[in-house]
Amino acid sequence: MASTSNTDRVIDAGMIKKAHPEQTPPDVSHEGDVATEKGDSDGVEQAAPTGPTDGTPWVTGIKLVMIMSGITLVCFLMLLDTSIISTATPRITSQFHSLPDVGWYGSAYLLASASLVPLTGKIYQNFNTKWSFVSFFAVFELGSLLCGVATSSKMLIVGRAVAGMGGSGIQNGAFTIIAGCVPMQRRPALTGLLMGFAQLGIVIGPLIGGAFTQYTTWRWCFYINLPIGAVVGLLLFFVHIPEQLPKPKGISVVHIILRKLDLVGFVLFAPAAVQFLLALQYGGNKYAWNSSVVIGLFCGAGATFVCFILWEWYKGDDAMIPYSMICRQTVWTSCVVYGFLMATLLVASYYLPIYFQAIKGVNAMLSGVYILPSILSQSALAIISGALVGRFGYYLPWSLAGGIVSSVGNGLLTTFTPSTSVGKWIGYQILLGAGRGAGLQMPIIAAQNNLPPPLIPVAMALIMFCQSFFGSTFLSYADVIFTNSLRNKLKEYAPEVPPESIIVAGATAFRKAVPADQLPGVLKAYSKSVDYVFYLAVGAAVATFVFSCGMGWKDIRGNEPPQPSGDEKV
C-alpha cells in the first residue's frame, strides 16, 4: 500500500514504451517510488521527468494565474450547466409542449458525456494537452449555442448531447493541465482551489437559472456560457501550457486516431454505457423495472461490456483502459472512492432541495440558498485540505477523515423532520460539506502521485467516468427508495390520500391537492421518505472510508522531480 512494486515498475516502463515508441523507456532497476533513467553521456542516474518535457520550466506568476483562472472558469461552467437547467425546465416544457421529454434534458448530456469519458484519456495521452482541452470546451460551447437557439424540444436535446460530448473531456483536461504546470507538492493546493470554486456552480445554478427564467428568458441559461467562454479563450490562447509527457512526433493525426485511440474499444464501451444508463433512466419511470425494455437494456449492456472486457484484454497495454493499470490498487480504489463521494454529493444536491421545497414549503430559489451551507463548507475544505496536503505531504488522512465526517453528516440528515430547526439543518449541512470537501480531491492526488506521467490522463478519465457511473446509479437507487417509501408512508400517516395523486402532483404542487387535515400526515410521509434516501448516502460515505484505505500511504513531497530548465514559451 505504501510503495509501488517492482512488477508495477516493469509494467509502467513497458506501457510507456508502447505509448511512445520513439522514447527510450527509463531504467527501472532502482529503489523507491521515483523512476530513474541513465544519462547517455555519463551514466549518472537522474529522476525521470514528471513535469514539463518540452524544455520549459514550471509555470509561475501571472501565467499560472491565467491558466488556473481559465480552467477553473471552464469547470465552473460545466458544473453550472448540470444544475442551471433545473429551474428553467418548467418554462421550457411550457414553450415546447414537451413534458414527456423532461428526462432527456438531463440524460442526453449524461449519456454523451459518460460514453466518451474513457476515450478522452487516450486523446490527452497522444495529442497536445492545451488544444485538446480547448477543443473539448469549444464543442461544449457549440452545444450551449444550439440549446440557446433551439426551436424545438428535439433540437434542445441534440444541443444537450453535443454539450455532453464537449464536457466529457473538461475535468480530465483540467487535472492533466495542472499536472504539467506545477511540481508534485503544489498540485493538491491547486486541485483543491479548482474544485472548491468550480463546485460553486452546482449550487448557484438553480439561482441563476431561476433569475434568467423569471426576468429575461430561459435561453440565457445557455447563452451565459458564450461570453465567459470568450474570456477563457483569451486567457488560454496566448499562454503556453507545458506537456507533462512527450507526445508522438512525426506521426500523422490519422495514424494516431487509428492506432493509438483504441476506437474498437470505444465502439464497444459507448453502447454498453448508454444501454446501462438508459435502463436506469427508464426503470421505474417510463417502464417498470421488470419490463422487457429495461431487462433488454441491462442484458444488452452486460453482453456488450463482456465483449469490451475481452477486447481490452486482447489489446493489453494499448487498450483504452489498460488492464495492467486498472489492476493497480491505488487506481481502482481511487476510482471507487471518487465515485462514492460524488454519489453522496449528488444525492444531497437532489434531495435537500426536495426537503426544503416539499416539507418546508419554500420556493426553488430559496431552496438553493438553503443548501449553501453544505456547498460553501465543501468549497472551503477543498481549498484548505489541498493546501495542507501540499504542505505536509500526506493525502490519506484527509480521505479517511472525509469519509468519517461525511458519514456522520449524512447520518444527521436522516434525523430531519418537518419541524427541524434552522440551526440544526445549517449545522448538519456544514458538517456534511466539510467531510466531502476534505476528501473529494484526494483520489485525484493519489492517482497523480502513484502513476507514471503517460498513464495519468487515462487514470483521470477513468475516475471521471466513475463519477458519472456512480452518480447515475445512486440517483436511480435513491429515486426507487424515495418513491416506494413515499407510497408506504402515505398509507401509514395519511391513509385517506391516494399515494399516486401525491407522486404525480410533484414535490411543490401536492399541497394544493391535499385536504388541510391530511397535510401534516403527508408532510411526515415525505420527510420519512427523504430520510430513507439519506441512509443510502450514509452507506456511500462509509464505503469511501473503507476503500480509502487502499489508496496508499505516501508522502508526495518525496516524489519531486528536478525542475526543468529553459525559457518558457508563450
Curated annotation (Swiss-Prot):
Biased composition (Basic and acidic residues): 28-41
Subcellular localization(s) per the UniProt record: Cell membrane
Gene deletion effect: Does not affect the production of azaphilone pigments (MonAzPs).
Gene Ontology CC entries for this record: plasma membrane
Alphabetized InterPro entries for the sequence: MFS, MFS_dom, MFS_trans_sf
Gene3D superfamilies recorded: MFS general substrate transporter like domains
Classification via SUPFAM superfamilies: MFS general substrate transporter (SSF103473)
Pfam families with a match to the protein in the record: MFS_1
Transmembrane segments: 65-85, 99-119, 131-151, 162-182, 192-212, 221-241, 263-283, 293-313, 336-356, 369-389, 392-412, 425-445, 455-475, 533-553
Region span, Disordered: 14-54
Record's note on what induces expression: Expression is positively regulated by the azaphilone pigments (MonAzPs) gene cluster-specific transcription regulator pigB.
Membrane topology per record: Multi-pass membrane protein
Recorded superkingdom: Eukaryota
Biotechnology: As colorants, MonAzPs are widely used in various food products for centuries. Moreover, MonAzPs also possess wide-ranging biological activities such as antibacterial activity, preventing hypertension, lowering cholesterol levels, causing hypolipidemic effects, and displaying antiobesity and antitumor activities.
UniProt entry keywords in alphabetical sequence: Cell membrane, Glycoprotein, Membrane, Pigment, Transmembrane, Transmembrane helix, Transport
Family, as annotated: Belongs to the major facilitator superfamily. TCR/Tet family.
Physiological role: MFS-type transporter; part of the gene cluster that mediates the biosynthesis of azaphilone pigments (MonAzPs), very widely used as food colorant.
Name of this chain's protein: MFS-type transporter pigP
Gene (name only): pigP
